[in-house]
Design a protein with these regions (language model features):
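Metal-dependent de-N-acetylase/amidase catalytic core
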Residues: 1-5, 93-98, 102-276
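Active-site rim/loop-helix segments in enzyme catalytic domains that contact anionic ligands
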Residues: 1-119, 147, 154, 261-264, ...
């Protein structure tokens, strides 16, 4: 049995960025673990009539949503790191000294090192240096995840605790969106009248160059798992969101493939379709 650890910024990122990947490897009998850095406590609230009353409980709500999401994906183990949500780039939340964006590296890296030593993953997934789309928490997750990948074997800075053992993950992956694939998908959806011009342009031209992608996981078998997982994050996705109503002829192509950049490889591993 192989093991995979996905380190994400917010509750719901595990679904959006890696949903079919996690479902696939869990279903195939591998140990799959999700570590979520922040509590999502400053996110939007959809589908509720009283969002102002719910904001004080948002972190608790989002943790429960995460648990339901992971159940939909078949993931049985997770770690809630509980750092404070940092808000979008350029907002006042970025200046909060308690937010994840403002944390010194040592504390969050140390927490993730403990998680790596606990679960002993063969591969670690996090984000690229831009964090996918420039969110402060995603950028910080990239930094912390990359640092912890190497720090897990650094006994000088991170001595072993209790019954811990040194663990060195074999591979580090950055979750990525192929710019070429995203543009093609959006164009198809726009031409079919499924998404608006605003949605079409929303993330354009975010993504990685297609030639930089090392692995494309085919999770078409698990598309419905991913949709159910995203729907579990009810406070974050409107019930009528177009992503829940993709016609069958587009659904597998749009949601069933997830891309990764192999950032570091200890050994001779080479695959264009498999992470572990």
């Amino acid at each position: 049995m192989s093991s995979l650890l996905a380190f994400h910024a917010h509750p719901d990122d595990e679904s959006v960025s890696t949903g079919v990947t996690l479902a696939k490897y869990a279903d195939e009998g591998n140990r799959v673990v999700v570590a979520t850095a922040t509590d999502g406590s400053a996110g939007e609230i959809h589908n509720y009539d009283n969002p102002e009353e719910l904001f004080p409980k948002l972190a608790e709500m989002r943790r429960k949503e995460l648990e339901a999401s992971l159940e939909a994906l078949g993931v049985k183990e997770y770690e809630w790191m509980g750092f404070k949500y940092s808000g979008m780039m350029g907002t006042s939340e970025n200046d909060d000294p308690d937010c994840f964006w403002r944390q010194n590296y040592f504390d969050p890296v140390g927490k993730l090192v403990d998680i790596i030593r606990k679960y002993k993953p063969d591969a670690l997934i996090t984000y690229d240096p831009f964090g996918g789309y420039g969110h402060p928490d995603h950028i910080q997750t990239h930094r912390i995840g990359t640092a912890a990948f190497f720090a897990a074997s650094d006994l000088d800075k991170f001595p072993l605790k209790d019954s811990q053992e040194v663990w060195i993950p074999k591979r580090l992956y950055y979750s990525a969106w192929s710019k070429k694939r995203m543009q093609s998908r959006r164009q198809q959806m726009f031409d079919a009248g499924i998404i608006s011009e605003e949605e079409f342009n929303r993330f354009n031209p975010i993504g990685s160059e297609h030639d930089d992608i090392d692995v494309e996981v085919d999770g078409t078998k698990y598309v419905e798992h991913k949709i159910k997982s995203m729907k579990a994050h009810r406070s974050q996705f409107k019930d009528d969101w177009w992503g829940f109503n993709i016609p069958d002829e587009f659904k597998e192509d749009f949601l069933g493939y997830e891309n990764y950049i192999l950032a570091f490889n200890r050994g001779s591993w080479s695959s264009e379709t498999d992470l572990i």
